[in-house]
Amino acid sequence: MKLSGHGLRCVRGGREVFSGLDVAAESGRAVAITGPNGAGKTSLLRLLAGLLALEGGSIGLEGGDPELTLPEQAHYLGHRDALKPALSVSENLSFWRGFLGGASRASGPDAAQALAAVGLDHVAHLPAAYLSAGQRRRLSIARLLAVKRPVWLLDEPTSALDVAGQSAFAAIMTGHLAGGGIILAATHTPLGIAARELRIGGTT
């Protein structure tokens, strides 16, 4: 499987963020997207996830499910955790599992297994409002496991994680790559896994 973008152009708020940008990632490989604030790291991920309109260039996924679009085969994990404070940890993950189609898929762990994998099984009954910043991040990461998708688009994925959390997430990413997955991550810090760097220039 190979994800590729050629000559990408992104415009936000009437301002050109970048143009002529090429990106590529293959099965089993990770790409660390680096660069100063405002360079377009998040914008690139959102283009690939189908959350921003592409103003120029082309994006494709070779070797994926031909009946699904790239956004339908990708997880986008933003720098903000999309959680409902009043719902329990388990309910939040179950919502996302159903919304993303995981409940109808045979592959991948169920919600309880995903929570155990990120060390949140003991707080599954608690409202998300009670979680620390690191725990909220781990709950968002559990979404990657609860619904199996080959492409992970991650925006500052290790933010709020302590050293143990970063190590655990590195193991999760390693497992995803070992299964033939693809990871593109915008980051200011090392991911803890082998990754090719794609640096985007720009101003802060």
Curated annotation (Swiss-Prot):
Which residue ranges does the record assign to the ABC transporter domain? 3-204
Q: Cross-referenced InterPro entries, in alphabetical order? A: AAA+_ATPase (IPR003593), ABC_transporter-like_ATP-bd (IPR003439), ABC_transporter-like_CS (IPR017871), ABC_transptr_haem_export_CcmA (IPR005895), P-loop_NTPase (IPR027417)
Which Pfam families does this one have? ABC_tran (PF00005)
Q: Which GO terms describe its cellular component?
A: plasma membrane
Query: Which EC number(s) does UniProt give?
Result: 7.6.2.5
What topology does it adopt in the membrane?
Answer: Peripheral membrane protein
Give the location in the cell. Cell inner membrane
Q: What is the predominant subcellular site recorded for this chain? A: membrane
Q: PANTHER family in the record, alphabetically?
A: ABC TRANSPORTER I FAMILY MEMBER 1
What family does the entry list? Belongs to the ABC transporter superfamily. CcmA exporter (TC 3.A.1.107) family.
Protein name, please?
A: Cytochrome c biogenesis ATP-binding export protein CcmA
The taxonomic lineage of its organism, from the top, reads:
Bacteria, Pseudomonadati, Pseudomonadota, Alphaproteobacteria, Hyphomicrobiales
Q: Which gene encodes it?
A: ccmA
